[in-house]
Amino acid sequence: MTKKKAHKPGSATIAMNRRARHEYFIEEEFEAGLSLQGWEVKSLRAGKANISDSYVLLKDGDAYLFGATITPLNVASSHVVCDPMRSRKLLLNQRELDSLYGRVNREGYTVVALSLYWKNAWCKVRIGVAKGKKAHDKRSDIKEREWKLDKARIMKNAGR
């Protein structure tokens, strides 16, 4: 009988899109599976993925992930053509697809990839329905973050 691998906390995340939370208000999040090829799974296990410029396009009743880069390994099979920027189909329920279509058809909404992670043996992508932030919204977020840090610093020093 084989031993189970020790699970390292935090090791399930492959890639994060930190820029998405800075540039968009995330209204709702969904978890979607990815339709991948064999070399892509190997590369994801090695952590060779980037989703910072990725977005989701809805067409023909399906959702596709565009702009995600999965860099092929050097030892990848030579008889398979490896396209690191190819569009990948997202695996969602029909109810979730309908919800995405309804929200994206509203003014100013888009769907962006937030994170790429492992759930058991399956690769999942967390996508979010987002609305773009204006420059003043970004500045107010920065002010709030700085105030939170200052408040924590003041409370820490007040106890001394």
Swiss-Prot record:
- Highest taxon of the lineage: Bacteria
GO terms, molecular function: RNA binding
Regions annotated as coiled coil:
none
Entry-linked SUPFAM superfamilies:
Small protein B (SmpB)
Keywords, ordered alphabetically: Cytoplasm, RNA-binding
Subcellular location as annotated: Cytoplasm
InterPro entries documented for this protein: SmpB, SsrA-bd_prot, SsrA-bd_prot_CS
This entry carries the following GO cellular component terms, namely:
cytosol
Gene Ontology process terms (BP): trans-translation
Q: Which family does it belong to?
A: Belongs to the SmpB family.
Cited function: Required for rescue of stalled ribosomes mediated by trans-translation. Binds to transfer-messenger RNA (tmRNA), required for stable association of tmRNA with ribosomes. tmRNA and SmpB together mimic tRNA shape, replacing the anticodon stem-loop with SmpB. tmRNA is encoded by the ssrA gene; the 2 termini fold to resemble tRNA(Ala) and it encodes a 'tag peptide', a short internal open reading frame. During trans-translation Ala-aminoacylated tmRNA acts like a tRNA, entering the A-site of stalled ribosomes, displacing the stalled mRNA.
What this protein is called in its record is: SsrA-binding protein
Highest classification ranks of the organism: Bacteria, Pseudomonadati, Pseudomonadota, Gammaproteobacteria, Enterobacterales
